């Protein structure tokens, strides 16, 4: 198997597509994504970071964002009893998008991506976000450090 930049892109695309929550996957500058297209959501957006080229391996640092568009609930959170699930959409989005990142992390640790030679070398810290792009979105961002064999090693 080859382990270049294309393959890491295909592997992450596959992991996001296999998530139980993600509807579409985009790459590159987040501001190039048409956030008004509601059919994109829930969305996984991947930002290429650095590539540390070592003698036998390459370690890619890649930011992965999983998000959904918010439609604010009319439920008053001060009314008792209050249930987050199914009522507070922001909480639902946080729950589902974090779970999607956990699925991707599991695939890199012991699933198909690990079997294919992609190894997660960090314990990703997931950060929640709440942004107003062209639509109001929220979700989680994680930075993955993924190690692959260096395809150009010299014997």
Which positions does each model-derived feature cover?
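A short, highly charged nucleic-acid-interacting micro-segment common to nuclease
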Residues: 1-7, 90-97
């Amino acid at each position: 198997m080859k382990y270049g930049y294309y393959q890491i892109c295909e592997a992450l695309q596959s992991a996001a597509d296999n998530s139980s929550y993600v509807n579409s996957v985009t790459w590159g500058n987040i501001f190039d994504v048409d956030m008004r297209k509601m059919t994109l959501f829930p969305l996984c957006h991947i930002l290429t970071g650095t590539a540390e080229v070592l003698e036998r391996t390459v370690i890619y640092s890649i930011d992965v964002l999983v998000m959904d568009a918010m439609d604010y609930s009319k439920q008053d959170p001060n009314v008792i009893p209050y249930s987050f699930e199914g009522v507070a959409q922001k909480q639902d989005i946080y729950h589902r998008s974090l779970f999607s990142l956990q699925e991707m992390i599991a695939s890199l640790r012991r699933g198909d991506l690990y079997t294919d030679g992609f190894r997660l070398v960090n314990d990703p810290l997931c950060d929640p976000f709440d942004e107003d792009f062209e639509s109001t979105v929220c979700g989680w961002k994680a930075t993955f450090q993924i190690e692959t064999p260096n395809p150009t090693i010299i014997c």
